[in-house]
Design a protein with these regions (language model features):
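Alpha/beta-hydrolase-fold serine-hydrolase catalytic core, especially in secreted/extracellular enzymes
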Residues: 176-185
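Catalytic histidine neighborhood in serine/cysteine hydrolases
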Residues: 140-154
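Gly/Ala-rich beta-loop-alpha elbow adjacent to hydrolase catalytic centers
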Residues: 8-17
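Conserved alpha/beta-hydrolase catalytic His-Asp/Glu region
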Residues: 43-44, 60-113
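Catalytic histidine-centered segment of alpha/beta-hydrolase-like enzymes
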Residues: 151-165
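Flexible "cap/lid" loop of the alpha/beta hydrolase fold
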Residues: 22-59
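Conserved serine/cysteine hydrolase catalytic core
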Residues: 97-139, 156
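Conserved acidic catalytic loop of the alpha/beta-hydrolase fold
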Residues: 1-5
Length: 185
């Protein structure tokens, strides 16, 4: 493989993508991050919240998805089975490691200015994580920061996966965001 044209990362999986981006010698064309993964918490907070989050996530399996709306902003049938399966397979140890590794309040890793110009950090205007947008802008001043007006965390990709895929294709082909009615800069 000579080049990766597009790297896409959402939620906590973005930490893996960021580790890849900071460690690879592979040329990267474009990167799209869903903004929610940039939440940062103190280590102690992560330790305290892990058992509660574990029970909340496991409840998705125990209730056959009945608690999804209480945990996430939506309970679409299209995603319910995914969350049920994920919660069934979740272990406490894996969740603890993921929280402690992913949401730690530490400086964002540095990225080359040229790569930043081709990175898109999307935030939904009504998601809780929107408050972290300014910190990401300060860490990566050359990046692109579209706001999905009226959208919550990952809502566009869940509600319109085809439209989301077309948007990503456009980014890779045209080095920019398509004109979508809900996007503001």
């Amino acid at each position: 493989m000579e080049r990766l044209e597009l790297v896409v990362a959402s939620s906590i999986g973005a930490d893996l993508a960021m580790a890849f981006l900071t460690g690879t010698k592979q040329p990267i064309g474009h990167v799209f991050f869903d903004g929610g993964q940039f939440a940062q918490i103190a280590k102690g907070t992560g330790r305290v919240m892990t058992p509660f989050l574990y029970i909340a996530i496991k409840s998705l399996y125990w209730s056959k998805g009945g608690t999804l709306k209480k945990i996430l902003w939506c309970d679409d049938d299209s995603i319910k089975l995914y969350f049920i399966a994920a919660s069934e397979n979740l272990t406490y140890t894996n969740l603890r490691r993921q929280i402690l590794d992913s949401l730690e309040d530490k400086p964002f890793p540095s990225l080359p200015e040229e790569l930043q110009k081709h990175i898109y950090f999307e935030f939904g205007s009504i998601e809780d994580h929107f408050k972290y947008r300014q910190a990401v802008i300060e860490a990566y001043p050359c990046g692109n920061y579209p706001v999905f007006e009226g959208y919550d965390h990952m809502q566009y990709q869940i509600r319109d996966p085809k439209g989301f895929a077309e948007m990503l294709t456009y980014i890779a082909a045209h080095d920019g965001m398509p004109k979508l009615p809900f996007i503001r800069k």
